[in-house]
Amino acid sequence: MSEELLNTTVEQEYDASQIQVLEGLEAVRKRPGMYIGSTSASGLHHLVYEIVDNAIDEALAGYCTHITVTINPGDTITVTDNGRGIPVDIQAQTGRPALEVVYTVLHAGGKFGGGGYKVSGGLHGVGASVVNALSEWLTVEVHKEGKIYQMKFARGNITQEMRVIGNTDRHGTIVTFKPDPEMFDTLIYDYETLHTRMREQAFLNAGLRIEIADRRTEDGPSDSMCYEGGIREFVLWHNRHKTPLHEEVVYMAGVRRDAEAEVALQYHDGYNETIVSFANNIHTPEGGMHETGFKTALTRVLNAYGTKTGVIKTDADKVSGEDCREGLTAVISVKLTDAQFEGQTKAKLGNAYIRTLVDSIVNEQLSTYFEEHPAVARTILEKAMTANRAREAARKARELSLIHISEPTRPRLIS
């Protein structure tokens, strides 16, 4: 077996000649997985998300109301927004146009100083340049102050300096790119994958219209999404094939310390738990502090209400967190100025104070909601207590089964 193991021994002397300095965007092309997670289909689609995230940052800042994503023939992508347009004036530190800096320098953008954006979802400020580095070619057009500015790149290198190509009465940014076949295992975009992500973003940004179209065929699918109800409608969408236990979606929101949180929830008659969380519009599939705060407060509020109304009489009657979340559909969305994600792909939110914020909002507002809607509160509490009883019954059954298995079998006497 030992012959099959990788030999990790290095014979060469370890000196300065082994130290590589990667200039510009070389680091991205050398280790793309560090920036987009993988070079599989997931990473391919991540390129689109990064450009869209930049457009959504404009929406969060209050300047963008419409985003369009187009899959073109040949699986190139065009993302159009009606935001302010990427700055085109000279950036002081580099002496180069800001547009060039955004697309050619890692960790460059309007997200670091706090002046350009209060909150943002882009990939730690490296999204545009990473997409550029991993594209066979990329063209960006900026409509700003009556002029159309254009710049072109190939694999992160400038092929056309920024220049004015016309006049316009619009404002915003248009980015078109072709993923580099040298970088990715697949180059075929899946419409449904992109559609799901765009629908998600439309729910999270109430009133923002996002359109997506597949132009690879004449009759390709398209959709236009705008949800004035925001995450309330997101919860209803998740429960569209379920039977809700209460008609109204419970909605809670609040602001503390330059951070805001909103939570929407509704219970159904099923048994599965669905909690979908986001930070600055970025899905956090592994949860994080915002989910922890929500779960803790939900359990506390239900037990407090049950105790206050006499439904919960002893500690043994108290419901666990798992009991409280049976049949629950919830969407949690937080926006904060200094989001700390664990990992470049933002799977988990790490800001500790967000836990306190979400806990406080849910504790206060859900308690008030239960006081004002006792019928809904009783329905939810009864479901949790039913789950508790079922869990206890299952535990006792397992214990009896273990006792039965552990009992020695007595030999029978044969007369």
Language model features with spans:
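Short conserved segment of the HATPase_c
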Residues: 86-109
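Conserved short strand/loop->alpha-helix "switch" segment adjacent to the catalytic nucleotide/phosphoryl-transfer site
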Residues: 30-49
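Hydrophobic alpha-helical segments, chiefly the membrane-spanning helices
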Residues: 414-415
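Mature N-terminal segment immediately following signal peptide/propeptide cleavage
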Residues: 17-30
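Residue-level signature of the cytosolic catalytic core of signaling kinases
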Residues: 17, 40, 91-95, 227
